[in-house]
């Protein structure tokens, strides 16, 4: 019988059912120290766990929650900004609707750069007559009053004309911020278009679950075979039955897949070929929005804090804080980073620590220098923010994202910053405002079927369900990730 040569490390499942030399112990090989001889060797039955804890699941359990859903799609909405702030251009000689304005501000986007997205439209910018605004261009800030509004054109007059004339029309985009209003005595709203009420805007997002499956099979004969190696698994299975290890590894790998898919997935585009493979219609309905995709498209991305030196890393970290200030300013945040980024942050913090020579800190054994030296930091405060740092095994392990990062270059992921706590959103499925963690998993469930993590056994081994002389273990899950308030997240690349 021909035996296909396998790898030295039997750590990856074979892509197809085949006999590999790495599945067996060769009793005649010199590496087995002469098992063909008549003397009994000293047998170490316990399988060595050379890769430590191999599973990476648990990240979403730390930072999120799980909740059932009954639909093919989950829809949620998020608050828009409270205050009216716009980007645009300024024409110092412009007039609007013959109002006698001494300047015209033309709206191009809202303060976040949206021109027709996230509930904002140029025609509904919200600026009204008699609003007092701050008008800024590079080097100058003026206080102006709105005297006319015609679509995206806003006519203004300055409280100090001398300052207004200093603005440069070619200096780039201008910013207009409403700070209040002023009316004369006895003045009243007249219900015209220039005095209509402002309705709050909201942003609506959606995601859909994906169906994930895996499978393990062992024949009735092999299920009863006793091996000489004592095996154990992350799931707690142990003994001398090899199929117990194989089944437990399949289950542990599938559990990791449930989390890895929620981190890495992306929704299909209208031109994707995956739709045809899955038989989906309309096009673009394949895939689901994972965490990293959501942050890249709706959140923040930084390339800073790379360990160049402590001073540079600190300046780059402060830039992250400045970006958080522009967003929700969530006080407590959790950092999940790879090893190099974790060490860079430790070095950055150690450089600012005045305790101990060279900025070292004796953080264990009652801070005794003679007992232990702690050069790592798990939590720190900078500005008004608290950060809790943790190593992210998924980004370090060579068999997961760590191996991908080694060849990904500038697209390598070094970590993610996630806000702690919960957010208030309107759930259109529930029909009410609810508070949920910023991250939570939605899984399909009903009174008939719970598809959070569904397993069942078929065959004639054990509980007989068919005439097949096998034990077939099936695993299935249908789930998606809801990333609320992605503007408060930061991806480190």
Regions found by a protein language model. Name each.
Residues 1-371, 391-399, 418-493:
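Flexible, glycine/threonine- and acidic-rich loop/arm segments that mediate assembly and lattice contacts
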Residues 410-411, 415-416:
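Short, surface-exposed amphipathic charged segments that create phosphate/polyanion-binding patches used
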Residues 371-374, 410:
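Short, flexible coil/turn micro-motifs enriched in small/turn-prone residues
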Residues 381-399, 404:
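Catalytic core segments in nucleotide and nucleic-acid processing enzymes
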């Amino acid at each position: 019988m021909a035996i296909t040569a396998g790898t030295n490390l039997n750590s990856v499942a074979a892509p197809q059912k085949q006999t590999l030399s790495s599945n067996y112990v060769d009793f005649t090989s010199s590496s087995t120290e002469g098992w063909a001889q008549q003397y009994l060797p000293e047998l170490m039955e316990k399988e060595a766990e050379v890769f430590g804890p191999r599973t990476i699941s648990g990240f979403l359990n730390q930072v999120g929650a799980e909740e059932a859903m009954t639909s093919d799609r989950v829809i949620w909405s998020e608050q828009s900004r409270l205050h009216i702030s716009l980007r645009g251009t300024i024409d110092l000689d412009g007039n609007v609707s013959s109002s006698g304005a001494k300047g015209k501000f033309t709206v191009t986007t809202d303060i976040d750069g949206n021109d027709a997205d996230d509930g904002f439209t140029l025609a509904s910018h919200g600026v009204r007559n008699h609003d007092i605004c701050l008008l800024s261009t590079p080097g100058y800030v003026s206080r102006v009053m709105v005297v006319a509004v015609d679509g995206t054109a806003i006519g203004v007059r300055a409280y100090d004309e001398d300052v207004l004339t200093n603005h440069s029309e070619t200096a780039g985009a201008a910013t207009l911020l409403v700070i209040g209003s002023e009316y004369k005595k006895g003045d009243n709203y007249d219900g015209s278009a220039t005095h209509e009420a402002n309705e709050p805007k909201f942003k609506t997002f959606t995601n859909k679950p994906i169906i994930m499956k895996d499978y393990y099979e062992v024949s009735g004969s092999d299920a009863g075979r006793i091996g000489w190696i004592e095996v154990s698994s992350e799931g707690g299975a142990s003994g001398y039955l090899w199929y117990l290890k194989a089944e437990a590894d399949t289950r542990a790998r599938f559990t990791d897949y449930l989390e890895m898919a929620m981190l890495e997935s992306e929704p299909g585009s209208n031109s994707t070929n995956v739709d045809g493979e899955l038989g989906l219609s309309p096009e673009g309905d394949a895939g689901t929005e994972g965490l990293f995709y959501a942050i890249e498209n709706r959140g923040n991305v930084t390339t800073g804090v790379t360990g160049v030196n402590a001073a540079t890393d600190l300046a780059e970290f402060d830039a992250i804080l400045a970006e958080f200030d522009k967003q929700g300013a969530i006080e407590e945040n959790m950092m999940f980073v790879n090893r190099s980024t974790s060490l860079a942050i430790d070095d950055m913090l150690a450089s600012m620590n005045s305790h101990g020579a060279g900025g070292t800190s004796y953080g264990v054994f009652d801070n005794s220098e003679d007992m232990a030296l702690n050069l790592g930091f798990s939590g720190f405060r900078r500005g008004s923010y608290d950060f809790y740092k943790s190593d992210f095994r998924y980004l370090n392990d060579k068999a997961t994202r760590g191996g991908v990062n080694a060849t990904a270059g500038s697209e390598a992921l070094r970590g993610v910053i996630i806000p702690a706590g919960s957010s208030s959103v309107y759930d259109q499925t529930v029909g009410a405002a609810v508070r949920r963690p910023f991250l939570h998993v939605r899984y399909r469930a009903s009174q008939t079927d719970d598809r959070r993590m569904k397993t069942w056994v078929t065959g004639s081994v054990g509980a007989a369900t068919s005439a097949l002389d096998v034990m077939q273990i099936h695993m299935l899950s249908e789930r998606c990730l809801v990333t609320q308030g992605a503007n408060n997240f930061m991806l480190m690349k």
